[in-house]
């Protein structure tokens, strides 16, 4: 169906693309690479490189000097201020670092310079391997109009549309009328949803075109647009392709990326639901033909629009590794970054098409700092608390941030990618929901709750996805948060008082706010009133301590909690766990295990029943040393543990050195505030500690 030989003979224009294969086939071992990127993709590339014994070099802006990718690299170099145009987009600076460090190759990641043909050319001129496609292929696919012409000549299906150079409004109106409404206005040099408008009626075309042109000019410096037929109820299905310099090209099956907001992907899955083997083969063959049409080398993604009648059309080709590549890795059991390194060394592809198989199902959920209730407005701020589900062979947390890091205004607000795999779609989706329940972030708005609602939506569970999924189901997806249950409120009040008990046991401080509370003593019945502010509502909870707390009870306590609605909740065997950041208890006969409850500044946040609730704490109730810290053995600033001088269970004296910590190029001695017993030492030698984290608990 797709004949590359006929294509070359038919049009000499394409011959220059084909010459990228079968040349310079001598294998060139790569021992050091520079990653010209930041965040999670830089960390992702480094992980594979290190596993293969390849040294890594990081570049960073002033805003990223303490970033995870900098600490992961074998070497790191400052390349400029925070603004990307003065750092990560400066090709000459990156080439200079590559030369200084002795890096033989540059991996561009995605974004920034990854699809910049001039940078690929610069690497070649400087004798540095660009881990990506040839510059000719980047140029060919970088223009939406030119790439569609190439696809038409290659026999790849394309959407009816106008891709001409005449940008006059009269011509655009005429072409739109020929195509038929609704139409999609797209920036010729666009990407990431920028410069894209849907126009339903002819009378709205002029406004849509002008708006698209303004956005295209601001984003890409090019105002040209194209007009395409807008397909109703379409799906966004993309094919992962890989090619080497020996003429081999394969596809690694498809990913469904239909669920989007602001024309940007938010959740992806592989394989695509409800796709027949026949259609899968047709789309895979078309993607390979598209790659061969431009002499492609390396990892690439061919994006298609799939209509309700299973006809599909070429949309664009991303000439880089995609954000969502991990789900392809999960279902094929292949490391695509490792494939990139092999191809960059002029090796052949590790596998042939017939050897590649689909195993199970995988989802990726993108966790963003954004507010879904405000049209997904991006946010910034400090990750005051961050805890994730435990990574494994079937669960990946792809991230470039740690607790205490800032989500900056300068870069994309993506915090992480949560990737799960299981034997089939139903099990994988259940796994994703459970993992989202274990993902806890405090300090800024995120889309985690939205992702939970999305993953439990009946239409999504049935695989009935399309690019308009979120607008269509907006009302149910944007439902207001459920009221806080009696159980959750009782757990919140109980956890706050347990932190108080731990505080009293850890340190009897005459200056502590607890010394003025009066009457609250372990093993004595006491009624205490706790006040919270939840948004605009004041919540009053009366808690009666009814026993427990002795050695025989293993630190468990019993409470009777009376809520302001008059309901009485019995909380038994309540105990703090995991560095005092979770609570376990029986509440009215139901057992809650390790419910996250964290204090940051003046707010207690509790994660329970799939919800995140924030309760402001009056100052007379807040435990001293809150922000998730109990007692006074806290890190004075971010740093590294260099020595631990005691063991759990040791008896220590007030002022005795407990551990040494290196921070800001100085060594700090952390001493015991009281005479007592070492109850916990959360950190080991050489571990990195964030600001204001508990280093030890003495009781």
Swiss-Prot record:
GO biological process assignments: L-leucine catabolic process
Subunit composition and interactions: Probably a dodecamer composed of six biotin-containing alpha subunits and six beta subunits.
Keywords: ATP-binding, Biotin, Ligase, Mitochondrion, Nucleotide-binding, Transit peptide
Taxonomic source organism: Dictyostelium discoideum
Pathway: Amino-acid degradation; L-leucine degradation; (S)-3-hydroxy-3-methylglutaryl-CoA from 3-isovaleryl-CoA: step 2/3
Active site: 320
Domain Biotin carboxylation, residue spans: 30-475
Location of N6-biotinyllysine modifications: 665
Compartments it resides in: Mitochondrion matrix
Cofactor(s) of this protein: Mn(2+); biotin
CDD domains named among the record's database cross-references: biotinyl_domain
Protein role: Biotin-attachment subunit of the 3-methylcrotonyl-CoA carboxylase, an enzyme that catalyzes the conversion of 3-methylcrotonyl-CoA to 3-methylglutaconyl-CoA, a critical step for leucine and isovaleric acid catabolism.
Domain ATP-grasp: 148-345
Gene3D superfamilies: 2.40.50.100, 3.30.700.40, 3.40.50.20, ATP-grasp fold, A domain, ATP-grasp fold, B domain
Residues in Biotinyl-binding domain copies: 624-699
Protein name according to UniProt: Methylcrotonoyl-CoA carboxylase subunit alpha, mitochondrial
Gene Ontology molecular function: any one: ATP binding
Source organism superkingdom: Eukaryota
Principal localisation: mitochondrion
Catalytic activity, reaction form: 3-methylbut-2-enoyl-CoA + hydrogencarbonate + ATP = 3-methyl-(2E)-glutaconyl-CoA + ADP + phosphate + H(+)
Taxonomy of the source species: Eukaryota, Amoebozoa, Evosea, Eumycetozoa, Dictyostelia
Record bears the keyword Signal: no
């Amino acid at each position: 169906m797709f004949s590359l030989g006929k294509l070359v003979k038919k049009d000499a224009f394409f011959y220059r693309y084909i010459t990228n294969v079968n040349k310079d086939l001598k294998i060139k071992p790569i021992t050091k690479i520079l990653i010209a990127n930041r965040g999670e993709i830089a960390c992702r590339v480094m992980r594979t490189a290190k596993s293969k014994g390849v040294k890594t070099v990081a570049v960073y802006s002033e805003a990223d000097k303490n970033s995870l990718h900098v600490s992961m690299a074998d070497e790191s170099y400052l390349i400029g201020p925070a603004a990307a145009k003065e750092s990560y987009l400066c090709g000459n600076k990156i080439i200079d670092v590559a030369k200084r460090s002795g890096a033989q190759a540059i991996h561009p990641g995605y974004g920034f310079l990854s699809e910049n043909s001039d940078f690929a050319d610069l690497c070649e001129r400087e004798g540095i391997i660009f881990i990506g496609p040839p510059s000719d292929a980047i140029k060919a696919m970088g223009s939406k109009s030119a790439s569609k012409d190439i696809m038409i000549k290659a026999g790849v299906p394309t959407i009816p549309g106008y891709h001409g150079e005449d940008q006059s409004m009269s011509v655009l109106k005429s072409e739109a009328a020929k195509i038929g409404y609704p139409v999609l206005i797209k920036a010729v040099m666009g990407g990431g949803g920028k410069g894209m408008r849907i126009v339903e009626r002819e009378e709205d075309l002029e406004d849509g075109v002008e708006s698209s042109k303004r956005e295209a000019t601001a984003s890409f410096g090019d105002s040209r647009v194209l007009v395409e037929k807008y397909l109703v109820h379409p799906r966004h299905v993309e094919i992962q392709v890989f090619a080497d310099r020996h003429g081999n090209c394969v596809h690694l099956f498809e990913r469904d990326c239909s669920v989007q907001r602001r024309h940007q992907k938010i959740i992806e899955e592989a394989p695509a639901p409800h796709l027949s083997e026949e259609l899968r083969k047709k789309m895979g063959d078309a993607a390979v033909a598209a790659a061969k049409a431009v002499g492609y080398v390396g990892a690439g993604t061919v994006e298609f629009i799939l209509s309700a009648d299973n006809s599909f059309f070429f949309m664009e080709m991303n000439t880089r590794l995609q954000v969502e590549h991990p789900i392809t890795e999960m279902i094929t059991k292949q490391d695509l970054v490792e494939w990139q390194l092999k191809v960059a060394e002029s090796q052949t592809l590790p596998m042939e098409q017939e050897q590649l198989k689909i195993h199970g199902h995988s989802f990726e959920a993108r966790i963003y700092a954004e507010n879904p209730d405000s049209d997904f407005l991006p946010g910034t701020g400090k990750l005051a608390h961050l805890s994730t589900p435990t990574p494994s062979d079937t669960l990946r947390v792809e991230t470039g941030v740690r607790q205490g890091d800032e989500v900056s205004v300068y870069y994309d607000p993506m915090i992480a990618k949560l990737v799960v795999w299981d034997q089939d779609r139903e099990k994988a989706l259940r796994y994703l929901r459970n993992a989202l329940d274990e993902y806890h972030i405090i300090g800024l708005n995120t889309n985690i709750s939205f992702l939970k609602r999305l993953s439990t939506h009946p239409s999504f569970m049935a695989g009935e996805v399309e690019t308009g999924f979120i607008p269509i189901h907006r009302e149910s997806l944007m439902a207001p948060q459920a009221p806080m249950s009696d159980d959750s409120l009782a757990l919140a009040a109980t956890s706050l008082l347990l932190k108080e008990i731990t505080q009293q046991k850890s340190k009897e401080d005459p200056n502590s706010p607890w010394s003025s509370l009066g009457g609250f003593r372990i093993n004595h019945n006491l009624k205490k009133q706790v006040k919270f502010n939840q948004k605009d509502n004041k919540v009053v909870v009366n808690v009666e301590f009814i026993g427990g707390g002795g050695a025989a009870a293993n630190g468990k306590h019993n409470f009777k909690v009376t809520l302001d609605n008059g309901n009485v909740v019995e909380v038994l065997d309540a105990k703090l766990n995991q560095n005092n950041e979770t609570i376990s208890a029986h509440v009215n006969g139901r057992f809650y295990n390790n419910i996250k409850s964290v204090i940051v500044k003046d707010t207690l946040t509790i994660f329970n029943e799939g919800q995140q609730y924030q309760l402001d704490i009056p100052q007379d109730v807040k435990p001293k040393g809150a922000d998730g810290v109990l007692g006074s053995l806290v890190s004075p600033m971010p740093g590294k543990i260099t020595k631990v001088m005691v063991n759990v269970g040791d008896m220590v004296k007030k002022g005795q050195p407990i551990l040494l910590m290196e921070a800001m190029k100085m060594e700090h001695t952390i001493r015991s505030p009281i005479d007592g017993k070492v109850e916990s030492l959360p950190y080991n030698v050489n571990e990195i500690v964030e600001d204001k984290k508990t280093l030890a608990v003495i009781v």
